[in-house]
Structures are given as C-alpha cells and as structure tokens.
Regions:
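Conserved SAM/SAH-binding beta-strand->alpha-helix loop
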Residues: 101
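Conserved SAM-binding strand-loop segment of SAM-dependent methyltransferases
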Residues: 112-122
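Short alpha-helix
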Residues: 190-208
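A short glycine-rich, Lys/Arg-flanked "PGG" loop and its adjoining helix->strand segment in the class I
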Residues: 147-159
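A short SAM/SAH-binding and catalytic strip from SAM-dependent methyltransferases
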Residues: 130-146
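Conserved class I S-adenosyl-L-methionine
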Residues: 71-80
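S-adenosyl-L-methionine
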Residues: 2-66
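Conserved beta-strand signature within the Rossmann-like core of class I S-adenosyl-L-methionine
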Residues: 160-168
Length: 228
C-alpha cells in the first residue's frame, strides 16, 4: 500500500466511504444537523453543520483577512459546503475548494464557488503554487495523521505562501477511530485526529513548517504557518 493510499481518510466497510456514503452528505443537503463524530469508546464530538452551511461569520473573517494580498490563489482543503470559498471570492481572492463529499461540492457551486471532488491526498491543480492553503473546521484531523497532512498541505504552497490551520481550542493530542453519526444512523469507521496549538506546532516543525502567527477568535484557535 502506498503512503497516499494509506493516508486516505477512510477505513472502508463494504462499499461505503466516510463523508461520502454516510449522514454527513445528507446533513449538508438539509443544511442542518444534529451530527457527531462517535468514538469507539462511545463518546462523541458535535459537528457544527449549521455553521458550516451558513455564510462566513465570526472567526472566519480572520482567515479571509489573512488571505488578502497573497500573491497566488487560495486552496481550501476539506472545504465542506463552501462558505470560506464563497467568502474569499466575495473579498476578491481567487479560491478553489477540495472535498470528497459530492453534497459539499454541489453546495459550493450553488454559492458561486468551485470545488473539486477529490481527497486532499489526490493529485491537485497547481501543486506548489498556491498562495494560501486552508485547513479549517477540524480538517487537521483528515487521515488521522496530522504530520502527514501538514506535510501535504505545505507542499502545495508556493514559496512565501501561507498555511492557515484551525487547531482544537484546547491542548489535546489524540487519534481515534470514529464514525459520522446522525439521527438516522452512522457511517463506516475511519481514523481521525485532534490537535491543539502546541501539538500542531510540534508536528508542523517536524515537516519543515514554521509558525508565523497564532491567534484565537470567537472560541476558535488558529496557526499561520510558512515553509522554512
């Protein structure tokens, strides 16, 4: 198995794929939850579907602000329903989303944006030439290996580009097998990670990324990283 295949955000059960053939796509189409990530131990983490499907607000504006004036377009990895892509375009910043969920890609298009239905580990346009790359809304967890994901995201950046990462607000460092769960059932299991600011920065430095900025806004925590 190649590293790329191993890091896909899926442990397949039958033909179902997480974020694709599970309650997430149905929630995006409905524009609302409730929706959770259910851990194997029974605990669960709420997913903010309503916020993701609404226009950019609150801490989102800090991400958009930091993309103004970048020398090249912005790539939103795991763009979900596309609110950040739409907000960037409205601010005059060229942007493209990437997501494995067809409902997310369709929702992004309805907002006037463009998204590709691909894994972040698939081949993507303009690799090494993006002015900014976003990992927001918990997407640092994709694949269950934050170090590998940060290395992948950093490799997409142009020289001088900026990687904007939303971390967990608290200092946590965990990897767990989870399922997306809604009122009508749960999807297949897959590996997911959560890292707070310190754990994220340790992994970033290990793959050649350096901290440019750290900030908190509206209860959310962020890092801006550059290639060293």
């Amino acid at each position: 198995m190649s590293p790329r295949t191993a890091l896909r955000p899926a442990l397949r059960t039958g033909t179902a794929e997480p974020w694709v053939d599970d309650p997430f796509g149905r929630a995006v189409r409905a524009g609302r939850g409730p929706l959770w990530l259910r851990r194997a131990d029974g605990s669960r983490l709420a997913l903010e579907v309503e916020r993701w499907c609404a226009p950019a607000a609150g801490a989102d504006h800090g991400l958009v602000l930091r993309c103004l004036g970048l020398s090249a377009p912005v790539l939103d990895l795991g763009c979900g329903p596309g609110r950040l892509v739409a907000a960037l375009l409205a601010a005059g910043v060229p942007a493209l989303g990437v997501d494995v969920c067809a409902a997310s890609v369709e929702h992004t298009a309805r907002l006037g944006g463009l998204a590709l239905r691909r894994s972040v580990f698939d081949r993507l346009p303009a690799e090494g030439r993006w002015g900014g790359v976003l990992l927001a809304d918990g997407n640092l967890g994709i694949g269950g290996d934050p170090g590998a994901l940060l290395a992948r995201a950093g490799a997409l950046l142009a020289p001088g580009g900026l990687l904007l990462v939303e971390t967990a607000a608290q200092e946590v460092d965990e990897v767990a097998d989870v399922r997306v769960e809604g009122p009508d059932g749960a999807g297949p299991p897959f590996r997911w990670a959560r890292c707070g600011p310190a754990a994220t920065l340790r992994r970033a430095r290990a793959v050649g990324l350096e901290r440019a900025e750290r900030w908190d806004s509206h209860g959310r925590s962020f890092l801006a990283l550059t290639r060293s």
